[in-house]
Amino acid sequence: MSTNAIAKRYAKALVQIGAEEGNVDKFSGELSQFTGVLAGSTSLTAVFSNPAYGIEAKKEILKEIMTKLGLSNNVANFLQLLLDRNRLPFLPQIVESFNSFADDLSGVIRPTLTSGLPLEQSQIDEIKNSLTKATGKKVVLKVEVDPSLIGGVVTKIGDKVFDGSIKTQLAKIQDILQKG
């Protein structure tokens, strides 16, 4: 089974449990806390990925981390399950899938807006409002600046790309001129 399929299966199960209890946001925060601890410590990552450490030692370390973070029983049990089934190395992908499912559940999209020049807040708000009206969902916009675009904006929503950059327009003109 592919890593992506594994991640989606575990993430979907945790989102369903969170949705039943109204704790999806809480679970998301707790998963982020835990992954932050792992990402901040190469030695912890090494321990959990090294088969030389026994499962009991890993369980004790995991239990200690979960206690210090004050994780809910559901998230703690979920992490314990991942450890038992040797799925902890997939945690970053699981968290990414979890957040995606949670966004779908709550009607949130997270597009990326890339512009050639820094945009004013009023322009960002106008684009955000347009996206909200077009999609009917809450928009959490990530804004980036890429000077290579020269001007205009590129908006990415999931797999869809809306490219209104001058760079792309110039490339199209160049292509037309070359073809004659």
Swiss-Prot record:
Q: Which stretch is the leader sequence?
A: none
Q: What is its main location?
A: membrane
Q: Which residues form a coiled coil?
A: none
Query: Which terms in the Gene Ontology molecular function aspect does this entry carry?
Result: proton-transporting ATP synthase activity, rotational mechanism
Q: Does the keyword Manganese apply?
A: no
Into which family does the record put it?
Belongs to the ATPase delta chain family.
Q: How does it assemble?
A: F-type ATPases have 2 components, F(1) - the catalytic core - and F(0) - the membrane proton channel. F(1) has five subunits: alpha(3), beta(3), gamma(1), delta(1), epsilon(1). F(0) has three main subunits: a(1), b(2) and c(10-14). The alpha and beta chains form an alternating ring which encloses part of the gamma chain. F(1) is attached to F(0) by a central stalk formed by the gamma and epsilon chains, while a peripheral stalk is formed by the delta and b chains.
The name on file for this protein is ATP synthase subunit delta
Question: From which organism does this entry originate?
Answer: Geotalea daltonii (strain DSM 22248 / JCM 15807 / FRC-32)
